[in-house]
């Protein structure tokens, strides 16, 4: 299959919403600093803005501008780093840069350093994290193939990054970095 990575990066730079394979399902994403793109993503997904989104990245450095690490201990950060890259999402204190649409109007933001090779390439090529939510209409089954994304979301998204999902076959686990509380079973 021919890579369309550059086409996806171009769409992101133009403020468009894209779909891409992750560890367990296809994700929908956009530039986390583009409010119009985030609003479009929420509209496409039919997702309430107070639910928030995940930021997915190639490495921790991409996430740092969106985080306020001052209230996390070295031990708490070590727990987080021990799971990355991988299918583990952590809720951490947000910095002022994190959009309220990404945080769901909370003081925290959900973040993940992906180990999926295409997500790694996409975020590296784009130079920053992406918003991430499962590529499906709210309440519908998550999409696991390009064809399912096309069937469910069709012309509402600009481009789909060609590729296969990882072998997890379910969304990532979500935990609170401060308390370790399990927020979503992975």
Swiss-Prot record:
Record's catalysed reaction(s): L-threonine + hydrogencarbonate + ATP = L-threonylcarbamoyladenylate + diphosphate + H2O
Enzyme Commission numbers on file: 2.7.7.87
InterPro entries hit by this protein: DHBP_synth_RibB-like_a/b_dom (IPR017945), Sua5-like_dom (IPR006070), TC-AMP_synthase (IPR023535), TC-AMP_synthase_SUA5 (IPR050156)
Highest taxon listed in the record's lineage: Bacteria
Pfam family, one: Sua5_yciO_yrdC
Xref: PROSITE patterns: YRDC
Keywords tagged on the record: ATP-binding, Cytoplasm, Nucleotide-binding, Nucleotidyltransferase, Transferase, tRNA processing
Record flagged with keyword Ribonucleoprotein: no
BP term (GO), one: tRNA threonylcarbamoyladenosine modification
UniProt cross-references to SUPFAM superfamilies, sorted A to Z: YrdC/RibB
Entry coiled-coil feature ranges: none
GO cellular component: cytoplasm
Enzyme class: transferase
Record's subcellular location: Cytoplasm
Keyword Cytoplasm included in the entry's annotation: yes
GO molecular function terms attached to this record: ATP binding; double-stranded RNA binding; L-threonylcarbamoyladenylate synthase; tRNA binding
Biological function: Required for the formation of a threonylcarbamoyl group on adenosine at position 37 (t(6)A37) in tRNAs that read codons beginning with adenine. Catalyzes the conversion of L-threonine, HCO(3)(-)/CO(2) and ATP to give threonylcarbamoyl-AMP (TC-AMP) as the acyladenylate intermediate, with the release of diphosphate.
Family as reported in the entry's similarity comment: Belongs to the SUA5 family. TsaC subfamily.
NCBIfam families membership: L-threonylcarbamoyladenylate synthase
Annotated protein name in UniProt: Threonylcarbamoyl-AMP synthase
The encoding gene: tsaC
């Amino acid at each position: 299959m021919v890579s369309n990575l550059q086409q996806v990066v171009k769409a992101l730079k133009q403020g468009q919403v894209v779909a891409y394979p992750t560890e367990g399902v296809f994700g929908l994403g956009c530039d986390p600093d583009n409010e119009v793109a985030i609003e479009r993503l929420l509209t496409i997904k039919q997702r309430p803005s107070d639910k928030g989104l995940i930021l997915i990245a190639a490495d921790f450095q991409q996430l740092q501008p969106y985080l306020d690490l001052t209230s996390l201990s070295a031990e708490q950060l070590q727990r987080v780093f021990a799971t990355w890259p991988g299918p583990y999402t952590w809720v951490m204190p947000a910095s002022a840069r994190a959009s309220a649409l990404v945080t769901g109007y909370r003081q925290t933001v959900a973040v993940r350093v992906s180990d999926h090779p295409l997500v790694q390439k996409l975020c590296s090529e784009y130079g920053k994290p992406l918003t991430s939510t499962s590529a499906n209409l709210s309440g519908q089954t998550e999409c696991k193939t390009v064809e399912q994304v096309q069937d469910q979301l069709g012309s509402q998204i600009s481009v789909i990054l060609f590729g296969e999902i990882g072998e997890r076959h379910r969304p990532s686990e979500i935990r609170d970095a401060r308390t370790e509380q399990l927020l979503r079973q992975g």
